[in-house]
Amino acid sequence: MQLADLTQRLAALGAKPQHIGRITRAWLQGKPLDTGTKHQKTENFLPLSVRQELPAIAAELDALVRLRSEHPGADGSARLLVELADKQMVESVLLPRDGLCISSQVGCAVGCVFCMTGKSGLLRQLSSAEMVAQVALGRRFRPVKKVVFMGMGEPAHNLDNVLEAIDLLGTEGGIGHKNLVFSTVGDPRVFERLPQQRVRPALALSLHTTDAELRQRLLPKAPRIDPEQLMELGEAYARSIDYPIQYQWTLLKGINDSQQEMDNILRLFKGKFAVLNLIPYNSLDADNYQRPDGERIVQMVRYLHSRGVLTKVRNSAGQDIDGGCGQLRARAVDLVNTSRLRLSRH
């Protein structure tokens, strides 16, 4: 289901824009679709034809996503394993301070070497309704005032659906435009489309290195955009929305934590409307990467910050509960496959 399908269905039942808006807002808040207001009951507002169909519509919306399991973290986050109607699984993460990280694809085609999600490749796109449904689900647990498209998938590879979801969340969803964050490895279509939108979200760009050849190895299927060019594109968007770009940098010991990288960061970030997020690597099973030790990370932050680069350390939420993107899903899929194998042997 796409969000447009819901609107068209309600309109066909005789719902006016104000009716559709109220029903949509109730869904986005994780409330029953027939929720009224303090001053007006549903039966005095919605047409009878719409009210009669609401139970069936609610059942379809509830079927979009289902909580498979919840995994609270020591940092106040909670990782949600979410099952879709076709039994595929994605991850959402409730973040401290009323944030929610959602997925835009099942799997991912970019194939970042340090990311579990990319190891499965792209399995399918999420519809705009499936993305918004993750927000509705999250709001059943706690308030959600910020939504970041940083879960499984590359939003630029599902651009129409992601932009449709962002538009609804930034209007009927009641989320401030700067509290909607579009995260991408960098794609020319993103820089063309985002400035044209009614809701223009904040932007996070996966940089990870200042070395173009190294970036190609780390992000093998990302568009071939030189880091310097990527930052120029980001800068233009930052100035247009008057909000800084977040540049993501997954810290890999001995790979992108050198003094040369830091000096290049100083050069590229000079005068930029930007924030650098250093993300210590979250180890996967049987991989070849490690995070730098804590002392080295502190040195990097102090060096960059003291020279004018606003630098923050962002640990993956819920590191104690398979915190790296895609790890929870990978373990669940492995358990399902193992169970099927055992059954086939009996």
Curated annotation (Swiss-Prot):
Domain of life the protein comes from: Bacteria
Intracellular or extracellular location(s): Cytoplasm
Cofactor annotation remark: Binds 1 [4Fe-4S] cluster. The cluster is coordinated with 3 cysteines and an exchangeable S-adenosyl-L-methionine.
Active-site residue list: E91, C325
Cellular component terms (Gene Ontology): cytoplasm
Keyword Metal-binding: yes
Keyword flag Transcription regulation: no
EC number: 2.1.1.-
Gene Ontology terms for molecular function: 4 iron, 4 sulfur cluster binding; metal ion binding; RNA methyltransferase activity
InterPro entries: Aldolase_TIM, Methyltransferase_A, rRNA_lsu_MTrfase_RlmN/Cfr, rSAM
Disulfide partners: C101-C325
Binding sites annotated in the UniProt record for [4Fe-4S] cluster: C108, C112, C115
Coiled coil: none
GO terms for biological process, alphabetical: rRNA base methylation; tRNA methylation
Identification of the protein by name: Probable RNA methyltransferase Pmen_2155
